[in-house]
Amino acid sequence: MKRILFAFLVAFSIFSLPTFAGGKGSHWPAGYVRVDGPNLVQANGEKLLIRGTNFGNWLNPEGYMFGFKKVNSPRFINEMLCQLVGPDEAAAFWAEYKDKYITREDVKFIASCGANTVRLPFHYALFTDEDFMGLTANQDGFARIDQVVEWCREFHLYLILDMHDCPGGQTGDNIDDSYGYPWLLTSEASQQQFCNIWQRIAKRYKNEPVILGYELMNEPIAHYFEADMALLKGNLEPLMKRATAAIRQVDKKHVVLLGGAVWNSHFDCFSDWTFDSNIMYTCHRYGGEPTPDAIRSYIDFRDKTNLPM
């Protein structure tokens, strides 16, 4: 499933371009986005309808976004670079890549187009001492997010943090940098690491209202694991509840976003939507007409849960 999510939930409106006071002295936003029934509500009481885009391929390199035909996941891309130019030059490339792929000017442009939110996919290894993007210790995940937070504050954009590549892999494809199976859903060690990293992230950003919320994982469980689908789906909601509980130990303010199984499209794996008062669901739609009927199952699930989708 090799696609780019350029917009999620709502398309850009280019006819309503905002102006920004911005600046480091800005006190925007006044408070946290929260869930209120099927809506997201800002601190001023106004509903928030997400308009935005996705910073894919920055902190989670993906081969198809580079235009590679055979090298697809982060570790394979790094292996290719090391074979071509050696580990030192590969590390130098990644350092410059992270500095230049997304910049303040990009965030400024996105805001000028009428967006109100950006989604930041990231690899869990950015919060470990694993070999990733040229570093084997002192990973810079927090430093990178801190910078995006300040850019978003300056240009009045909310930020969704999306763990696109989870320990063990949640999808079983190239997009999660896994070993070809969603081991996260069967490995206790991976699940504990997953929860620990989210708790560390939540502890750091618990008082940061620029962050709209924490998207626990991207597109869990690829469709082709049919033989294990019941097992994998059955393990998904308990893990999401466990991770949410870990977050709530340190952060009770931010929204937690839960994606459905099978590329964020199947929501029959969820049976309890009352375990937390500030959760929402997130769906991905590939193809189809831009009509309510094309996303009827998502609308029905939203109405059933009375939570934002």
What is each residue range found by the language model?
Residues 61, 128-130, 224, 266:
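Gram-negative outer-membrane beta-barrel proteins
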Residues 28, 33-34, 89-121, 126-128, ...:
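An active-site-proximal structural segment forming one wall of the substrate-binding cleft
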Residues 20-115:
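N-terminal carbohydrate-binding accessory modules
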Residues 1-4:
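Positively charged n-region of N-terminal signal peptides that target proteins for export
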Residues 32, 186, 192-213, 217-309:
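Extracellular glycoside hydrolase catalytic/binding regions
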Residues 7-16:
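Bacterial N-terminal signal peptides
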Residues 49-59, 116-122, 126, 159-161, ...:
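Structural recognition of the beta-strand scaffold that forms the well-ordered cores
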Residues 63-67, 170-175, 225-229, 268-271:
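Short aromatic-enriched loop/helix-cap "lid" or pocket-rim segments at secondary-structure transitions
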